Amino acid sequence: NEGFRDIDEKLLRILHHRSFLDDCTRIFRAIRYSERLGFIIESQTKVLLKEGIKEICNVSGTRISSELIRICYEPERVSMFQTLDSFGILKVIHPEMAFPEDLKKVSQVVDIENWDKTEISCLLLFSSNPEYREVIARSLHMSKGVLVALSGLKVLENLEENISNADIYQHLISVPEAAL
């Protein structure tokens, strides 16, 4: 049976040629499962996956956001985002969306599996162009909490280097914890 052979050879293969076109969120799942299980996406499946990428723009922001957040909770999240980036998927989601560079650094020092969706969403958007973070968050239908945290992030980024502790306190008192 071809399915058992694929498992033995650690190949991920779709069942029919329209699979990614019928539901292009399967692209995210294919990448997630291939990285999680150490499988290689079979060559014809990869061709069809690439063809399906252009359809991602027809998927609701909520579904895309949900898939990206699921990836953030995976142990292999960095390699999964590298794969998304290498296929150009992040740029299809939004031209200013960038690979979350800080994901690897943060993952090494903090257990982000326990973070809530607002914190994960902010981390996801942190490496994107600051001028477009809110636009990206809105296009992905992220929560109001994410939008508030992103505005707090702007406050943090605009802090001057040589500032007194009292001034730092005044600036940070209203910044949501997720932005910190």
What is the predicted role of each segment?
Residues E2-K10, Q44-E55, S60-R63:
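Short, conserved phosphate-binding/catalytic loop or strand-edge motifs used
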Residues N1-Q44:
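Acidic, glycine- and histidine-enriched catalytic cores of nucleic acid- and nucleotide-handling enzymes
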Residues C57-L180:
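Conserved, hydrophobic alpha-helical core segments of structured domains
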Residues G3, R26-A30, T45, I64, ...:
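Internal, well-ordered alpha-helical segments in soluble enzyme and binding-protein domains
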Residues I14-S19, R36, E55-N58, E67-I71:
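Flexible, glycine/proline-enriched loop segments at strand-loop-helix junctions
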Residues L15-R18, L48, D111-I112:
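Short, surface-exposed, polar/charged, turn-prone segments marking secondary-structure boundaries
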